[in-house]
């Protein structure tokens, strides 16, 4: 096992990365190794998808499957080894079918890629794990060095984050052939074990630029189906009655669940990154969408144990449900998996609803505590002139984009302290689950404009980018000249690709934490600092002083 993709990876003087019987996320060495094997199979599939496009062959089954299966290897998504192997077998079957299509057009069709003809050696998981050793990401570290390995992983993990957003967009009916062609090209190239530093740096920027387009179509899918988010108050306390909790990012799953629970007497609560759903008109119209439950994903083993109903996980993040003994009432959807947990293959939630009706639910309603969400792209753009007016009248000094992933590390209290230290004449724009560090606190307003503005999920960084570009255009300056600073927390690969997106668009002087990614060497961090001004957090006092004086 070797995995260094998330923020909680093991860090020692001898090197970084989880390389024991189990990773810090709870992933076993077996599952981790089989995910490496799956990635190799997907790289071979992408190699043939690139070749097929040369012949004008576009296989939509391949295009929809490839990012989805890649998504299953993202942190805290799928811990079920047999399902990972199933994805690998499906990847190889699709590759062979695509290869046959190419050969039907050109009998001499060939692909020069080490993954292009990969076959699984056995049905036995142990044998497959031994085969996977051939594809361990750091297998040639001694030959290439840590810097090249780090750049490879930056690209691989960034592309994995983009693949997750591609799947979210695909579920909503969004497809862009150029994006998929670019994805396959990069994925196939990474399967050749590239070792050119400049090429890898260029690739990382290409991934960021591609992801900006992905976020654009995801935004179109969400707003096209469910309307543009508008500011909405959400109760974060319990309401009496039967209940279901839904977590993850998939708004379509939430919509289907709301439709199927309507009139059943079962209330629905969002959790984690599903909180922004309350801002969408077509979702909040369901009166039994009664609120949001819990805090950051890392607290789920305590909070889910206390929730008196079933739980549905639609995407990341899931962690061991046996710890809180709720594994008999947590359900997985789509690419999510945990051994022994029931999985929903389709859109039918009837079994979950039946379980909810059989459980006690909340016995009484708590005193409501309302927070505000729903500052989507349209709302943000509508406030652009107000923001400019406040700045011109010196009522608004600075905007801090304070968001990203949450996690268990104690140093993450920095982000709570930073938020509470932001001066009263400054505004906090937040997104993603890092907001749970401070989104239930009171921040007041500036002439009626809330000082805490929740823009949505992690992918809604797109809205923040569009707002920044709009403000810069209206003020006749560059984005980096705005009174705007980005202080971002990271945990997994979606955060990595958001960072690459911002860097590829030329955004500079981003501050990140709580730690630097374990796969980035001091040399690589120095390069990113020199090129983009990217740096790690220090203390709240020092960072606040520096950012306000910039």
From Swiss-Prot:
Q: Which Gene3D superfamilies match?
A: 1.20.1270.20, 3.40.50.2030
Name the Enzyme Commission number(s) assigned to this protein: 1.7.99.1
Protein name per UniProt: Hydroxylamine reductase
Q: Can you quote the record's cofactor note? A: Binds 1 [2Fe-2S] cluster. Binds 1 hybrid [4Fe-2O-2S] cluster.
The answer to whether the entry has keyword Cell wall biogenesis/degradation is: no
> What cofactor requirement does the entry state?
[2Fe-2S] cluster; hybrid [4Fe-2O-2S] cluster
Which lineage is the organism of this entry classified under, starting from the top rank?
Bacteria, Pseudomonadati, Pseudomonadota, Gammaproteobacteria, Enterobacterales
GO BP terms in the entry: response to hydrogen peroxide
Instruction: Give the originating organism.
Output: Escherichia coli (strain SE11)
Q: Which Pfam families does this chain map to? A: Prismane
Q: Does the keyword Transcription regulation apply?
A: no
Per the annotation, which location comes first and is thus the protein's main one?
Answer: cytoplasm
Name the GO cellular-component terms. cytoplasm
List the NCBIfam families: hybrid_clust, PRK05290.1
For binding hybrid [4Fe-2O-2S] cluster, which residues are annotated in this chain's numbering? 249, 273, 317, 405, 433, 458, 492, 494
């Amino acid at each position: 096992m070797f995995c260094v993709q998330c923020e909680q990876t093991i860090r020692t003087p001898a090197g970084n990365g989880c390389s024991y019987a189990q990773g810090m996320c709870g992933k076993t060495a077996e599952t981790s190794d089989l995910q490496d094997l799956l990635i190799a199979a997907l790289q071979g599939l992408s190699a043939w998808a690139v070749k097929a496009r040369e012949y004008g062959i576009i296989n939509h089954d391949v295009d929809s499957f490839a990012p989805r299966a890649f998504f299953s290897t993202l942190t805290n998504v799928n811990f079920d080894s047999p399902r990972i192997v199933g994805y690998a077998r499906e990847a190889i079957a699709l590759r062979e079918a695509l290869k046959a299509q190419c050969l039907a057009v050109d009998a001499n069709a060939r692909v020069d890629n080490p993954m292009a003809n990969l076959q699984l050696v056995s049905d036995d998981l142990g044998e497959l794990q031994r085969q996977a050793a051939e594809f361990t990401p750091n297998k040639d570290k001694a030959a290439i060095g840590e810097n090249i390995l780090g750049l490879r992983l930056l690209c691989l993990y960034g592309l994995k984050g983009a693949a997750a957003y591609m799947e979210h967009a695909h579920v909503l009916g969004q497809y862009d052939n150029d994006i998929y062609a670019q994805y396959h090209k990069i994925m196939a190239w990474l399967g050749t074990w590239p070792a050119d530093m400049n090429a890898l740096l260029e690739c990382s920027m290409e991934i960021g630029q591609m992801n900006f387009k992905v976020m654009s179509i995801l935004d179109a899918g969400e707003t096209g189906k469910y309307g543009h988010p508008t500011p909405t108050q959400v109760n974060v306390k319990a309401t009496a009655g039967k209940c279901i909790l839904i977590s993850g990012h998939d708004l379509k799953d939430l919509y289907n669940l709301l439709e199927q629970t309507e009139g059943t007497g079962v209330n629905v609560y969002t959790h984690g990154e599903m909180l922004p759903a309350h801002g969408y008109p077509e979702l909040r119209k369901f009166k039994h969408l009664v609120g949001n439950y819990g805090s950051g994903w890392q607290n789920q083993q305590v909070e889910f144990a206390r929730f008196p109903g079933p739980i549905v996980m639609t995407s990341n993040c899931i962690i061991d449900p046996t710890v809180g003994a709720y594994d008999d009432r947590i359900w997985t959807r789509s690419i999510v998996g945990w051994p022994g947990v029931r999985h929903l293959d389709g859109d039918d939630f009837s079994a979950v609803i039946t379980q909810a009706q059989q459980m006690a639910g909340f016995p009484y309603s708590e005193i409501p505590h309302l927070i505000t969400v729903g500052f989507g792209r349209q709302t943000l753009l509508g406030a652009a002139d107000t923001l400019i007016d406040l700045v011109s009248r010196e009522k608004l000094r600075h905007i801090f984009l304070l968001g990203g992933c949450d996690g268990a590390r104690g140093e993450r209290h920095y982000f709570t302290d930073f938020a509470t230290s932001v001066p009263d004449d400054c505004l906090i724009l937040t997104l993603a689950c890092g907001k749970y560090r401070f989104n239930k606190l009171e921040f007041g307003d500036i002439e009626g404009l809330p000082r805490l503005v929740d823009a949505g999920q992690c992918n809604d960084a797109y809205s923040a980018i569009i707002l920044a570009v709009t403000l810069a255009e209206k003020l006749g300056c560059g984005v980096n000249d705005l009174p705007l600073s980005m202080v971002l927390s990271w945990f997994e690969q979606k955060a990595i690709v958001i960072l690459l997106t911002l860097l590829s668009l030329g955004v500079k002087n981003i501050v990140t934490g709580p730690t630097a990614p374990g796969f980035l060497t001091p040399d690589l961090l120095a390069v990113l600092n020199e090129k983009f001004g990217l740096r790690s957090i220090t203390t709240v006092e020092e960072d606040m002083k520096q950012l306000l004086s910039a």
